[in-house]
Every structure is written in structure tokens, then in C-alpha cells.
């Protein structure tokens, strides 16, 4: 059983009736769960925006939660509402954001809906299902070889993130107009 599922069963018995939105997931689940893994509030930053530019087009992309260690963003967590199946593009978006947020890039891009988490090492591409504890994250940072991304790679990641973000915005606009 994954640690987060175990933790939810023990700490949020009414998960299915109480947790509905991305905000619920962030505030009622991920935040206390991160504390249980050893992170302190001073190491967490929320809704931080980065500007992504492709040619003359510009967009702003926000992270849900960033974990900051020694003044550097090392993990970016994207919260999804429960029961929203995690798609490949969600994972790609989290990793792209993690690569652009800091120099050198953040170690991990994470997508989590409480039921499932996918944690991607941004350097190796390796995926796991457990959000690392703080000691695990510190060890990983310690061991990582952290080459700085080349300009050409940064531009490529920017274009991926830009496309993903804007197609999502477009989709949202389409959905919103359907709801009317």
C-alpha cells in the first residue's frame, strides 16, 4: 500500500465525502501529509507563477506547491482533484514546470490526486509512486549530478509547457462555454 493512501485512511477517514476539489486536495490532504514527511511550512510555497515565453507569445503557469530546500525549489507538486485520472500530459506538465522553476532545475515533479501519486526525477526521468520524505529528498539532492540545462533545452521545455498549458486553457474555455 502506498504511504499516502495509508496516511489518508488513518487521518482522513471521510476522504470520499470531504475531499472534492483540487483546493481540498492541496490544503486538507497534501499539506498535512507533507508535514508528516518532515517538511515544515517555511519550506513550502504556493501558487507561484512563472512566465513562459515562446517567441512573442507569453503565458503564466502556476505551481500548486513547491518545496524549497536551502533556498532552492527541489520539488514541485501539482494537486489534482480526487478521482481525476492522472494523464501523461499532467506528468509532463509537472516535470516541465520543475525543470524551468529554478537553476539548476528542481529534483522532482509530482502529480497527486490523493489516490495516486507519480513522482518523476527530472534528471533521470525515473518515476516512482511515493513522495519522498524530507531526509530522502536531502539524500537525493546530495547524490544528484546536476548539470545546468542548455539554452536550447530550456526553450524546448518552455515550448512543451506553453503548449500543454494553453491547450488546457483552451479546453477550459470550451468546457466553460458548454456549461452555459
Language model features with spans:
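A short, conserved, highly charged catalytic patch centered on acidic carboxylates
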Residues: 1-108, 116-180
Amino acid at each position: 500500500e502506498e504511504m499516502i493512501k495509508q496516511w489518508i485512511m488513518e487521518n482522513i477517514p471521510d476522504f470520499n465525502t470531504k475531499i472534492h476539489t483540487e483546493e481540498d486536495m492541496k490544503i486538507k490532504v497534501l499539506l498535512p501529509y507533507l508535514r508528516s514527511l518532515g517538511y515544515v511550512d517555511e519550506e513550502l510555497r504556493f501558487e507561484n507563477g512563472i512566465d513562459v515565453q515562446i517567441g512573442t507569445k507569453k503565458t503564466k503557469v502556476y505551481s500548486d506547491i513547491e518545496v524549497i530546500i536551502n533556498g532552492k525549489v527541489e520539488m514541485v507538486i501539482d494537486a489534482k482533484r480526487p478521482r481525476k485520472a492522472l494523464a501523461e500530459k499532467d506528468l509532463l506538465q509537472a516535470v516541465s514546470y520543475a525543470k524551468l522553476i529554478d537553476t539548476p532545475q528542481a529534483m522532482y515533479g509530482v502529480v497527486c490526486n490523493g489516490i495516486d501519486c507519480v513522482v518523476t526525477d527530472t534528471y533521470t526521468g525515473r518515476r516512482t509512486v511515493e513522495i519522498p520524505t524530507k531526509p530522502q529528498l536531502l539524500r537525493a539532492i546530495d547524490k544528484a549530478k546536476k548539470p545546468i540545462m542548455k539554452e536550447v533545452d530550456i526553450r524546448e521545455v518552455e515550448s512543451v509547457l506553453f503548449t500543454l498549458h494553453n491547450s488546457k486553457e483552451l479546453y477550459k474555455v470550451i468546457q466553460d462555454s458548454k456549461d452555459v
